[in-house]
Design a protein with these regions (language model features):
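Nucleic-acid 5′ end/cap handling module spanning
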Residues: 2-63, 80-122, 184-290
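Covalent nucleotidyltransferase core used to form phosphodiester bonds in nucleic acids
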Residues: 62-185
């Protein structure tokens, strides 16, 4: 069982104040997001109590499916929702032991969207990657990592399943519970496999993740764009950032000094990498490089 250090036990690195990886910035943004999401939950509860005395329709922002009258005119409908993207785990939260951790294989992040009869695969920027037939129920959206070598879609998160929306004010721990309950469902063929997950406290760190580790705050909603409630570390950063001993061999990149320096270098080079990188389709893309 892993022991997560307190923030006070970590040495504070000099950081760039304008960087998304700023220690103070990530801590504060994490608090602000949790506060805002709590306010949303409280508001929803208040509205539900109000409905007991006076009916009222509550409109929520849900994935936008193309109107039926336009579907024939658009053989490849646009992606109904955007991805939720991870930040580097630059600052270690005091409650990290309760966060979920998912070891991730190497592959390409994508959204699997099932319309009425066909399944569309979309990339990070909403670009259509491919179309195929699956056994998945219609009106289903899964956040996956596609492994080109095995042709397997590894499921990270569930945004919608069979018309049931999980993208609106549904906590991560609830989404993951519902997702794991689908294990063994006949509609999930061998091409779709749910990635294992556990809490940081229960993680043993005996097997190295091929690409890295995703960390999810248990109370976080699914929100598009970068979120401080979803964070990312490469395997060689775990001991440096979490101060946890890993049983797997640590292989660090050439010239590696510290995890924070590596993050800063990746952050400063991101625009250049995106500009020079060819289109995602048909490539292996590391999750921290997209």
């Amino acid at each position: 069982m892993a022991t997560v250090p307190d923030l006070s036990s970590l040495s504070l690195y000099k950081v760039k104040t304008n960087s998304i990886c700023s220690l103070a910035s990530q801590i504060e943004r994490r608090r602000e997001v949790l506060k805002r999401q709590k306010e949303k939950r409280d508001e929803q509860f208040s509205q539900l109590r109000f409905l007991e005395s006076e009916p009222e329709v509550i409109e929520e922002k849900k994935p936008q499916w193309p109107p039926r009258r336009h579907r024939r005119a658009h053989p490849h409908p646009p992606c109904p929702i955007e991805m939720m993207l991870a930040e580097w785990l630059f600052s270690v939260p005091e409650d990290l032991s309760s966060w979920f951790v998912i070891p991730c294989p190497r592959g390409q992040r994508c959204l699997v969207v099932v319309h009425s009869h066909r399944t569309h695969i979309y990339g990070k920027h909403g670009n259509l990657l491919r179309t195929m037939h699956t056994n998945l129920p219609k009106q289903t959206i899964l956040y996956c990592i596609y492994d080109h070598r095995s042709s397997i879609y590894h499921i990270l998160d569930m945004i919608m399943w069979n018309g049931q929306d999980y993208s609106t004010q549904i906590e991560c721990q609830c989404r993951f519970f519902m997702l794991m309950s689908l294990a063994g469902d006949s509609r999930l063929t061998k091409s779709f496999q749910i990635l294992s997950r556990t809490t940081v406290e229960e993680e043993t760190w005996t097997n190295e993740a091929e690409d890295g580790y995703l960390f999810y705050h248990p109370l976080g909603f699914y929100e598009t764009g970068y979120s401080p409630l979803v964070c990312w570390l490469k395997p060689f950063m775990i001991e440096d950032i979490l101060q946890i001993h890993c049983s797997y061999p640590i292989v660090k990149p050439l010239g590696y000094t510290t995890a924070h320096d590596y993050m800063f270098n990746e952050q400063s080079n991101r625009k250049k990498e995106i500009f020079n990188k060819s289109k995602e389709e048909g490539e292996f893309v590391s999750m921290d490089q997209e």
